[in-house]
């Protein structure tokens, strides 16, 4: 009985980390589900409201590496609690924001905490789970991301529709405060594995496989968020869905991420290259078919299942590759670069989507993202896989 109790306690830090992933992912994409509401309340266009996503992502992209280098010697539990506290304060500021730029400033505070969080979350998941459970640890925190899409983002949208988007942000602040207390109680002290100097960065960037991981991550995020950042108005205005059906479709999209998480834990290690190819090619195809599928609600939902599942699976697989190919004393730095570049892609995708909406048509966001996805898939097959094979042959 005591053994089972001790075994359960070993998983509590991962549970706390997964809850934290839930709120961090919920808030990053909260404006997607509330885009129309925020734009109307602040008297700005939907494209300008979409910049709340872009700027958030660009701040993460710019600040991930410098903030992580500064914090690289800090004890990890203390670091985790500090960034969660900043996250809570920033959400309260968002709820009280009087205008567009005040809201943008509070989002920048969230983005700075996010920049460090996603640099340390995957390595922490690997370090806190029992030996041999690496894939399960990574897939568990990915489940937190999926639940954010299933419950967090749609619930935030529902709250926003009925009582206002400000209450949504305040609710996240309250939930995150409880998560802070849980992590304070259960998380062990974990010392950093050494300070990383900026002088070591060139050697890290000479790793061709790691560079390929980073490039594919930027391309994927840009392609994905060109379409996904404007999925809410697309579903309402192009697919002709009612507000309730839009919410349901967002839930389906997020819920499919759990399928991606399960598929990673089941199939990834058996054939990593095949898994990676599927997770690059399938979302690309979904983007290209988005407009064609919009003629039917069920076709759109089916497409969202495949798209959502493969997007999550891609993210976990490339987090694993970052940790796998980065030097042991630089896994957090490798993840900070991955997170920064992925968020650069998110910002670029939201920006490209905004350009398409403003200068072409909302209906064309899938085609724009799909073209970028084709470039990503070609690079993956032509350059990344050969470099990956050479690297693994030398290990």
Which residues does each predicted region cover?
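Intracellular juxtamembrane helix-capping segments at the cytosolic ends
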Residues: 117-129, 313-327
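Paired small-residue
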Residues: 86, 90-93, 101-109, 298-306
């Amino acid at each position: 009985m005591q053994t089972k109790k001790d075994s359960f306690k070993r998983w509590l830090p991962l549970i706390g980390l997964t809850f934290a992933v839930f709120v961090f992912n919920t808030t990053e994409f909260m404006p997607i589900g509330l885009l129309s509401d925020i734009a109307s309340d602040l008297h700005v266009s939907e494209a300008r409201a979409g910049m709340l996503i872009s700027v958030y992502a660009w701040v993460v992209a710019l600040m991930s590496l410098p903030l992580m280098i500064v914090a690289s010697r800090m004890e990890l539990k203390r670091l985790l609690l500090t960034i969660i506290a900043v996250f809570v304060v920033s959400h309260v500021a968002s709820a009280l924001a009087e205008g567009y730029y005040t809201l943008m400033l509070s989002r920048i505070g969230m983005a700075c905490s996010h920049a460090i969080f996603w640099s340390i979350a995957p390595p922490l998941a690997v370090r806190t789970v029992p030996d041999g459970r690496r894939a399960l640890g990574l897939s568990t925190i990915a489940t937190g991301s999926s639940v954010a899409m299933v419950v967090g983002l749609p619930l935030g949208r529902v709250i926003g529709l009925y009582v206002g988007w400000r209450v949504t942000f305040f609710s996240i602040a309250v939930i995150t405060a409880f998560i802070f207390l849980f992590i304070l109680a259960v998380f062990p002290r974990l010392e950093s594995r050494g300070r990383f100097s900026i002088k070591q960065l060139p050697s890290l960037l000479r790793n061709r496989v790691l560079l390929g991981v980073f490039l594919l991550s930027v391309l994927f995020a840009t392609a994905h968020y060109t379409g996904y950042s404007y999925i809410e108005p697309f579903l309402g205005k192009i697919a002709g869905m009612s507000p309730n059906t839009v919410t349901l479709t967002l839930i389906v999209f997020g819920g499919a991420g759990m399928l991606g998480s399960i598929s990673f834990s089941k199939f990834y290690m058996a054939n990593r290259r095949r898994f990676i190819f599927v997770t690059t090619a399938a979302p690309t195809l979904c983007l290209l078919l988005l407009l064609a599928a919009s003629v039917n609600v069920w076709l759109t939902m089916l497409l969202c299942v495949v798209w959502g599942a493969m997007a999550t699976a891609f993210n976990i697989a490339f987090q694993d590759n970052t940790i796998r190919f980065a030097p042991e004393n630089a896994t957090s730095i490798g993840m900070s670069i991955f997170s920064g570049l992925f968020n650069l892609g998110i910002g670029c995708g939201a920006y490209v989507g905004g350009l398409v909406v403003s200068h072409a048509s909302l209906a064309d966001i899938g085609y724009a993202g799909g073209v970028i996805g084709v470039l990503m898939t070609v690079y993956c097959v032509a350059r990344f896989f050969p470099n990956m094979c050479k690297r693994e042959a030398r290990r």
